[in-house]
């Protein structure tokens, strides 16, 4: 099974709307490793590592986000996995 890493930047109303917490819960349910954090410019940055299909499911989730989010753009860069273990919210 092939593994990949997606480095994602999400724009819109994505801070203060439980986007990071919801992303962490979904990633843990999906069995994907990585992290998520708020950026000073109002975007959310996330990294997902795992099997291709599971990482793609997380990228698709980023287009929706939490119930209160309003996503306007998702930028994705695919990279070689770095062996991240677990999933965390970074500050």
From Swiss-Prot:
<protein>
    <recommendedName>
        <fullName>Acylphosphatase</fullName>
        <ecNumber>3.6.1.7</ecNumber>
    </recommendedName>
</protein>
<dbReference type="InterPro" id="IPR036046">
    <property type="entry name" value="Acylphosphatase-like_dom_sf"/>
</dbReference>
<comment type="similarity">
    <text>Belongs to the acylphosphatase family.</text>
</comment>
<feature type="domain" description="Acylphosphatase-like">
    <location>
        <begin position="5"/>
        <end position="91"/>
    </location>
</feature>
<dbReference type="InterPro" id="IPR017968">
    <property type="entry name" value="Acylphosphatase_CS"/>
</dbReference>
<feature type="active site">
    <location>
        <position position="20"/>
    </location>
</feature>
<keyword id="KW-0378">Hydrolase</keyword>
<dbReference type="GO" id="GO:0003998">
    <property type="term" value="F:acylphosphatase activity"/>
</dbReference>
<dbReference type="InterPro" id="IPR001792">
    <property type="entry name" value="Acylphosphatase-like_dom"/>
</dbReference>
<feature type="active site">
    <location>
        <position position="38"/>
    </location>
</feature>
<dbReference type="Pfam" id="PF00708">
    <property type="entry name" value="Acylphosphatase"/>
</dbReference>
<dbReference type="InterPro" id="IPR020456">
    <property type="entry name" value="Acylphosphatase"/>
</dbReference>
């Amino acid at each position: 099974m092939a593994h990949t890493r997606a480095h994602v930047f999400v724009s819109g109303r994505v801070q203060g709307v439980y986007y990071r917490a919801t992303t962490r819960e979904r990633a843990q349910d999906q069995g994907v490793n990585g992290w998520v954090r708020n950026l000073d410019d109002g975007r959310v940055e996330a990294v997902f590592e795992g099997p291709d299909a599971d990482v793609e499911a997380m990228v698709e989730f980023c287009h929706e986000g939490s119930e209160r989010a309003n996503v306007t753009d998702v930028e994705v860069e695919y990279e070689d996995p770095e062996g991240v273990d677990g999933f965390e919210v970074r500050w």
